[in-house]
Design a protein with these regions (language model features):
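N-terminal amphipathic/basic leader segments beginning at the initiator methionine
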Residues: 1-59
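Glycine-rich phosphate/diphosphate-binding loops that line cofactor/substrate pockets in enzymes
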Residues: 1-3, 59-62, 67, 93-102, ...
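Hard-cation-handling environments
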Residues: 6, 205-411, 415-419
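Active-site histidine-anchored catalytic micro-motif
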Residues: 7, 11-14, 18-20, 28-29, ...
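Low-complexity, highly charged intrinsically disordered N-terminal segments
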Residues: 54-75, 79-83, 87-94
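Cap/lid and interdomain-hinge subdomains that line or gate substrate/regulatory clefts
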Residues: 64-66, 75, 139, 146-149, ...
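Extended hydrophobic packing segments that form well-structured cores
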Residues: 67, 273, 386-506
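Flexible inter-domain linker/hinge segments
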Residues: 186-191, 196, 200-228, 246, ...
């Protein structure tokens, strides 16, 4: 019996239209750029979408895995035309050179923006569909913050969104996508997609799935999946920092019964609209947040999350308002990190461990959100910045900070890192000898993903409203291309309208 040849690919970026940092090809090569068999070494045993693809396929003796191309970059500004073109060209060439493909598993983000493309994932799927033909099944995984468009569903109904934030079910959704693809390929299952796009782009700060409005939505989605004829329900919050016509929240129902799928999508969209106001949060400023942290008596550290400069929300990782106030207060047993500052790391390398040095910290990429902080520091430790995640988010994945330095300023410790990276795993600190669990206050460049690994070792978590490109106050951005009217920028009425249903036949 001829084996089913199934390709695996990954093209992942979350793009911020207002970030000062354009995303070039170097960012992809620094984060993760793997071709062919390199994909096995990079992702086997990881709790990622591609790890899920591999685990399902390698246990099916009727399948031949065809590793193609995986490219990912840390969230930042829009992807340059050159970078996108290089990766798209190489991916399409890898598909052409692979020969016969009977199916394709593709991990995407869903919130990529390119200089010349508002909807690059749809563009890529269209190019792939031309290459492999209309009858080869494709299944994708998508981030919960995807700005999903109806055009993407023209190419396949099989899109599986994450159901957790922090995203700790990437592996699970990878397995779901692979199983659905095999069902279609081997059993002839026909899937239907029912899609509802809502006129809203809620701030992502309150999209955590442990509690709040997105928790409600995911619970309703899981209940719907228990009903006959419903295969999968994805709830996408969208990415509100994308200034594009397809921005915003949506619901996608993959079903075996098109009428049931349509009814479920409409119901879920109505529920989503009904909880929209619950996504709005009022956050304390930096000084107010620090005062609150100082008032808390706890055996565990209090976290001050600098959410407006979270690198995984495309922040530069080097804004300074929270850092400046913490340095002024000089509180014992405090830790701040990771601050993106390769220049200061280089200065620490030149000075050497144990020596004192004058540094100008942060404020180099985004000085409009705070000038550099002038400090006298002691170099405590230096590192190449390489570690492996131990927490549930991207578990076991290798991380390369491109260098790191532990410095002490007064009574506080600061971790400097060589590229923007959210402080989502304690190993970022532990790999250089810092134990966050022993501190009184942690100032973290992070938003929600860090909770997966940090919640067991910390106490109170306080989000602070400091200046930054990832502010939860969407009125601070000047949009040009988003659809209007749209909530929360506009006060509008909305009712779910009946839509057509796309059908995919194999």
């Amino acid at each position: 019996m001829r084996k089913h040849r199934i390709g695996i690919a990954f093209f992942y970026h979350e793009s911020h239209s207002f970030s000062p940092m354009k995303t070039e090809i170097e960012q992809f090569r620094n984060e993760g750029y793997f071709i062919g068999d390199e994909i096995y070494d990079a992702y086997t045993g990881t709790k990622t979408e591609v790890g899920g693809f591999l685990d399902v396929l390698k246990h099916d003796e009727d399948v031949e895995i065809v590793p193609l191309l995986c490219a990912a970059a840390i969230p930042s500004g829009v992807v340059s035309t050159e970078a996108y073109s290089i990766i798209e060209k190489q991916m399409l060439e890898s598909i052409q050179q692979a020969g016969r493909l009977d199916g394709l598993l593709l991990a995407l983000h869903g919130a990529m923006v390119v200089e010349h493309l508002f909807d690059p994932e749809e563009h890529l799927l269209g190019k792939i569909r031309v290459l492999i033909g209309p009858n080869v099944p494709i299944a994708t995984t998508l981030d919960m913050h995807a700005n999903l468009s109806e055009k993407m569903i023209d190419y396949t109904p099989l899109h599986f969104g994450f159901k957790t934030y922090p995203h700790i079910d990437m592996y699970e959704q990878g397995t779901h996508a692979a199983i659905a693809l095999l069902n279609q390929l081997k059993e002839g299952v026909t899937y239907y997609a029912s899609f509802e796009k809502l006129p809203m782009m809620p701030p992502s700060i309150n999209m955590r799935t442990a509690e709040g409005p997105m928790h409600k939505m995911i619970e309703w989605a899981k209940q719907a999946e228990e009903e006959a004829g419903i295969y999968n329900v994805s709830v996408f919050g969208g990415f509100p920092y994308s200034d594009i016509p397809v921005v915003g929240a949506s619901v996608l129902v993959v079903s075996l019964d098109p009428q049931k799928g349509k009814e479920t999508a409409q119901k879920m969209a109505s529920l989503f609209w009904s909880v929209r106001e619950e996504f709005i949060m009022d956050l304390p400023g930096v000084r107010e947040g620090l005062a609150l942290a100082m008032s808390i008596e706890d055996d565990k550290p209090v976290v001050l999350a600098d959410i407006s400069d979270n690198p995984l929300s495309c922040g530069s990782g080097d804004t300074t308002e929270l850092l400046r106030e913490m340095v002024k207060m000089n509180i014992p047993d405090t830790l701040f990190g990771g601050l993106y500052d390769p220049e200061s790391i280089e200065a620490c390398l030149n000075a050497g461990v144990g020596n004192k040095i004058s540094l100008s910290l942060g404020g180099k990429v985004s000085p409009e959100f705070g000038e550099p902080v002038q400090v006298e520091a002691t170099v405590v430790a230096l590192s190449d910045g390489v570690f492996h995640n131990s927490g549930p988010f991207n578990q076991h994945l290798r991380v390369d900070l491109k260098g790191a330095a532990h410095i002490r300023v007064g009574k506080m410790d600061i971790l400097l890192i060589g590229r923007p990276m959210s402080a989502n795993d304690p190993e970022m600190f532990r790999h250089i000898g810092l134990e966050p669990a022993t501190k009184r206050i942690l100032g973290l460049k992070a938003k929600n993903h860090f909770r997966a690994a940090f919640e067991p070792i910390v106490g109170r978590i306080i989000y602070v409203d400091a200046p930054g490109v990832a502010s939860n106050r969407l009125t601070t951005f000047t949009y040009h291309y988003i659809p209007k009217p749209i909530w929360p920028l506009d006060d509008i009425q909305y009712e779910v309208k009946r839509r057509g249903t796309e059908k995919w036949t194999h």
